[in-house]
């Protein structure tokens, strides 16, 4: 019974660390995207960040 308990604890720990790494990657990408939108120096000149007009600017169609 103790071995089953240890296996459950191990599986939970491994799952937790894996999930943390996945979420850190997503958070980093989201933060980088937010910085691009807020900082005028990082934006493409003449590019509109409004989703309604992006298709008409920046060569995105």
UniProtKB/Swiss-Prot annotation:
Task: Give the UniProt tissue specificity note.
Answer: Expressed by the venom duct.
Signal peptide, first to last residue: 1-16
From the UniProt record, which GO molecular function terms apply?
acetylcholine receptor inhibitor activity; toxin activity
Record keywords, A-Z = Acetylcholine receptor inhibiting toxin, Amidation, Cleavage on pair of basic residues, Disulfide bond, Hydroxylation, Neurotoxin, Postsynaptic neurotoxin, Pyrrolidone carboxylic acid, Secreted, Signal, Toxin
* Statement: the UniProt record of this protein carries the keyword Disulfide bond: yes
Q: List the disulfide bonds.
A: 47-53, 48-58
GO cellular component terms, semicolon-separated: extracellular region; host cell postsynaptic membrane
Q: Which residues carry this modification: Cysteine amide?
A: 58
- Kindly list the positions at which Hydroxyproline occurs in this protein: 45
Q: Name one Pfam family in it.
A: Toxin_8
Which residues are processed away as propeptide to yield the mature protein?
Answer: 17-40
| Localization, UniProt | Secreted
- Which positions carry Pyrrolidone carboxylic acid? 43
Family in the record: Belongs to the conotoxin A superfamily.
> Domain remarks in the entry?
The cysteine framework is I (CC-C-C). Alpha4/4 pattern.
Relay the record's extra comment: Negative results: has no effect on chimeric alpha-7 (CHRNA7), alpha-3-beta-2 (CHRNA3-CHRNB2) and alpha-4-beta-2 (CHRNA4-CHRNB2).
Task: State its role.
Answer: Alpha-conotoxins bind to the nicotinic acetylcholine receptors (nAChR) and inhibit them. This peptide potently blocks muscular nicotinic acetylcholine receptor (CHRNA1-CHRNB1-CHRNG-CHRND), and has no effect on neuronal receptors. It is able to totally displace [125I]-Bgtx from the Torpedo receptor with a complete inhibition in the high micromolar range. It produces a biphasic inhibition curve which fits nicely with a two-site model (Ki of 0.46 and 105 nM).
- Please report the name of this protein according to its UniProt entry: Alpha-conotoxin EIIA
């Amino acid at each position: 019974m103790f071995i089953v308990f240890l296996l459950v604890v191990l599986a939970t720990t491994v799952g937790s660390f894996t999930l943390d790494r996945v979420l850190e990657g997503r958070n980093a990408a989201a933060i980088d995207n937010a910085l691009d939108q807020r900082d005028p120096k990082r934006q493409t000149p003449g590019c509109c960040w409004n989703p309604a007009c992006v298709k008409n600017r920046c060569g995105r169609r």
